[in-house]
Amino acid sequence: MTITNYINNQFTFLDMAEPWQLGFQDPATPVMEGIINFHHDLMFFLISIVVFVCWMLFRVITLFDEKKNKIPATVVHGATIEIIWTSIPALILLTVAVPSFALLYSMDEVIDPIITLKVIGSQWYWSYEYSDNLEFSDEPLIFDSYMIQEDDLAIGQFRILEVDNRVVVPTNSHIRVLITASDVLHSWAIPSLGIKLDACPGRLNQTSMFIKREGVFYGQCSEICGVNHGFMPIVVEAVSLEDYLTWLKNKINFDFNVXLIKFYGI
């Protein structure tokens, strides 16, 4: 057993914002990995452009000083330099745009999901529905998720981030997420999963996620939705497929073996 596997078996990773954090949270999905890699690649161009512009400004200030140039130059046209300062930015934009298009496409792509999670935002809580289990159960799994008040927090729980009912999903599985709202605009955002999607009343938005490792992932509503906007946390717990089915069995009554064979094909 490798050290990494040992750590994964002994601990549950917590992915959440930290005080004074400047960087990204650790990615748990291929989409978030792509976002971070694209950000790092883009920073090369941004830093290079900033350095070049600052150098040009410094050269202009030092070379075209009134004391050094009593008579200003009368250059009114330069075809070569105009072609250069038009073509180079265009090439830079193309270099940035092409990878971003591929990333945007992958964020919208839904690949044969085994679970559909319905998310409904309300003032000021989230509602969740698992309806795929209707194939082997009489009713869907529906529950609300409220923030745990500070006085009710247990040891080890986090202020303004913990909820009474977590979203539980399996790892290494394609999951479709359908998001809407019942009253005003909300936004379902989980940084570690690379998800930030608006919840709009009367409209159904769709995204997908493929979580690669077990852990607990924290997020919050990121659309100002009223006085308690800051008290709408999101907690997604990713577990193994067997643990997910065990959790589902404790919520609803169904045959465990039937679910494995009929629904998941294993």
UniProtKB/Swiss-Prot annotation:
CDD domains: CcO_II_C (cd13912). Its cofactor is Cu cation. NCBIfam families: CoxB. Cu cation A2 binds at C221, E223, C225, H229. It is found in: Mitochondrion inner membrane. This is Cytochrome c oxidase subunit 2. GO terms for molecular function: copper ion binding; cytochrome-c oxidase activity. One of its GO terms (cellular component) is mitochondrial inner membrane. Residues 1-43, 104-266 are mitochondrial intermembrane. InterPro entries: CcO_II, CcO_II-like_C, CcO_II_C, Copper_CuA, Cupredoxin, Cyt_c_oxidase_su2, Cyt_c_oxidase_su2_TM_dom, Cyt_c_oxidase_su2_TM_sf. Component of the cytochrome c oxidase, the last enzyme in the mitochondrial electron transport chain which drives oxidative phosphorylation. The respiratory chain contains 3 multisubunit complexes succinate dehydrogenase (complex II, CII), ubiquinol-cytochrome c oxidoreductase (cytochrome b-c1 complex, complex III, CIII) and cytochrome c oxidase (complex IV, CIV), that cooperate to transfer electrons derived from NADH and succinate to molecular oxygen, creating an electrochemical gradient over the inner membrane that drives transmembrane transport and the ATP synthase. It is an enzyme of class 7 (translocase). It comes from the Eukaryota. Its main location: mitochondrion. It is a multi-pass membrane protein. The chain crosses the membrane at residues 44-64, 83-103. Cu cation A1 binds at H186, C221, C225, M232. Mg(2+) binds at E223. One of its GO terms (biological process) is ATP synthesis coupled electron transport. The gene is COX2. The keyword Flavoprotein does not apply. Residues 65-82 are mitochondrial matrix. Belongs to the cytochrome c oxidase subunit 2 family.
